[in-house]
Structures are given as C-alpha cells and as structure tokens.
UniProtKB/Swiss-Prot annotation:
This is Thioredoxin-related transmembrane protein 2 homolog. Keywords: Membrane, Signal, Transmembrane, Transmembrane helix. Pfam families: Thioredoxin. A motif (Di-lysine motif) lies at residues 268-271. The lineage of its organism: Eukaryota, Metazoa, Ecdysozoa, Arthropoda, Hexapoda. It comes from Drosophila melanogaster (Fruit fly). Residues 1-28 form the signal peptide. The keyword Hydrolase does not apply. Gene3D superfamilies: Glutaredoxin. It is found in: Membrane.
Amino acid sequence: MTWKKQMALLAKPYYWVNILLAISYLLAKKTQFICTRLFILAGEDEACDLDSREVEILFFLLIVVMIRSRKTGSVTMINYLASSFLYTKVANAILWAYADFRYGLGFLLLCVLVGMVLPEPSYRGPEHITYFRNAQVFEEELARDKRTSWLICFYTVWNPSCVNFAPVFAELSAEYNTDHLKFGKIDIGRFPDVAQKYRISDSSFSRQLPTVILFQQGKETDRRPCVDSKGKLQKFFFSSDNVRATFGLNQLYKEAIERLPIAPKEAKKVQ
C-alpha cells in the first residue's frame, strides 16, 4: 500500500478519532488549559507533570505495542495503528482511572460509543478472489484445469495477521488475475480437514496464519511461511512486494497470458 493510499485512509474518522483517544491522557496532561481544570494536585506545576507510575505505564504500553505489532505481521503504518489502538485505549483507561476513577469510567464509555459508531473500515477496492465454501469444490477446482495456476490463501476470520493481509491479497488478485492465474481463499477454521491435509495449524497460537500456497498443475509448488531444513518455521512478512517476489507473480502472469487463446483477428494476422 502506497503512502498516498495510507494517508487517504488516515483521513477517515475511525483512524483520527482513535488516534485522539490513544493520546488523550498525554494531551490532557501537556495542554495547560485542560490540565489545570482536570487535574487537581498540590500545585499547578506538579499537576501537569507525569509521575513515575504514569511513565511506567506509558513505557509498558510502548513495549506491548511493538511486540504485538510484530506478532500480527503489521507491515504498514495503517496496520501498526490498527493493531495498537486496543492497547493504547486500555493504557489510557488505566491512566485516567489512576487520576480519577470517574475519568476512567467516562473514558471507557466513550471508547464503547466510538466502537459502536465508528467500526474499522474494511477493504472496498477491486478484487478477483474465489472464496471456497466447500472442501470438495476446492479440490475439484485445483484438478479441473491443469494449465491454471492457483494462489490460495488459507486463513481464519479471527486471526489479526489474516485480517491485515486481506487487503494486500485482494489488491494482488485485482492486478494479476487472468484465466490461467487465479486467486482463492479458504477458511480453515470452517474446514479443519483442509488444514490437516496441508499441514497448517489453526490454533490461536499458530504462526502459520495466514499461509499462502501456489498450486501449479494441481500440485503444491511453493508456500509461505515454510519450514527450513531443520524443520523450523521461517517467519514471513506478507507485504505486497514480498508476495510478488517470492511467488514470482510477474513471471506467472506473463506465462498465463501466453497460454490464452489467440483472438480471431490476431490469428488471421499471424497467418
């Protein structure tokens, strides 16, 4: 996702409202006008300074956000923000409650209201993805036309990494889909037998979600993430550039175009 697209997404109310909530306590503390009216301590100068406990909470929040963002496979600024909102709001609720229990309760109610009114925006761009609703149909489609290459994303609806990868996969499908290069998705949470067949763990601690497998002539030829020679799972960042390069989408697209039948007018010219 380009910076231009990310900045356009940031203009949506969901993001800037949640950013304000994420920095609300720090903003209130450092804005003199707000601080002197909300926080009543021994002196006005002390009221607007963060004490040691507040600093500890903020540093702990920073560490948690960094760790969780890496675990969820965040590869863009939007992904980092979306994955950090929950933790920043929890930390702010603790900080507001630490200052005054009523402030903490009011902040929680505000977060609930924002969550109801402003849900996270989903990808609404073009896509050419086949969603397999049946394991048998999935296997039949792979074997139906051996000339067609399939790039299949195995996912679950609840996994944050799968959610982050969804718009990336959709954009790639819109760019590279042809009659002989197709993109598909199958929810292994609904079809555990498929997960078992392709050796993909769908547990809540799984590091294999999402898994993307390239099928050529009905057989698996490559996958990410994969295991090394020692049987250790190699971490893979599902960015658009990484997926293009790893699976050679440009070359696959070129080969798929060459397999297309020649149009009648073009055939006459060749003759």
